[in-house]
Amino acid sequence: MDVLVGSTGLIGQVLREAHEFGACFHSKNIHEAPLLKEPIERLYLACMPAEKWKANAAPLDDFDNMNSIIQNIRHLPSPAEVIVYSTIDVHGQTAYYAGGIPEIFAIDYGANRYIFEMLVKAAFRDSVVTIIRLPALFHRFIKKNILFDLLTNNNVEKININSAYQWYCLDDLWKDTKKAISGTTNQFFPAPIETAEIIRRFFPEANVSSGPRIEYNIGTYTATRYETMKKMEAFINAWH
């Protein structure tokens, strides 16, 4: 049986569209997870909240939530495999990555999610654990990020045009999950795209601001800027 934890979040919703799970858990029923007794083939963990601003504003609350999740899942029957959906932010910002995790974390959101990765490995020592790290996301299920704000004209004036993000289309998630399970790669970081380029091409009327530089540029790239922009264009056109 395959089990999904985090079934109502963004990634969880995408996974449920692509695959049938024998059991699904979310924040309202996660306390029932330890009651599961059936053998688990694969355990998919998409349960860490993605609200970076909230985690950075209250990192201790974020840590406590993470610990609560671990306590609820650690008593599950030992699965053959565990797949953890994590974030580019474990690497920090403004550096080209070609090796390990930095010793000093740039932000608490990333630090807590790296700790979560390690706690999962410790909790399931007899399982094969695959960590899948993703950057900024776009999909019809998104509820909050720069693209969502531009599409819904929400707090556009707070968007920092002096930024570059690596964007990933969640339509590829299940295909790439299978790649990660097979050992091909586990980090899906396309080439970075300047926010200014996105606004110039798709939202030329947006009245944005400019602040301190924010840049994500972590390789090795799994898609070109052109490939990502084509997918982003299709996503934006479908949204409208």
Tell where the protein language model's regions lie, with residue ranges:
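A short beta-strand-loop structural module common to alpha/beta enzyme folds
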Residues: 21-37, 46, 209-211
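NAD(P)-dependent short-chain dehydrogenase/reductase
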Residues: 106, 114, 118-174
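Short glycine-/acidic-enriched loop or helix-start segments at secondary-structure transitions
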Residues: 14-15, 53-55, 92-96, 141-143, ...
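Structural signature of the Rossmann-like NAD(P)-dependent dehydrogenase/reductase core
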Residues: 45, 82-84, 130-136
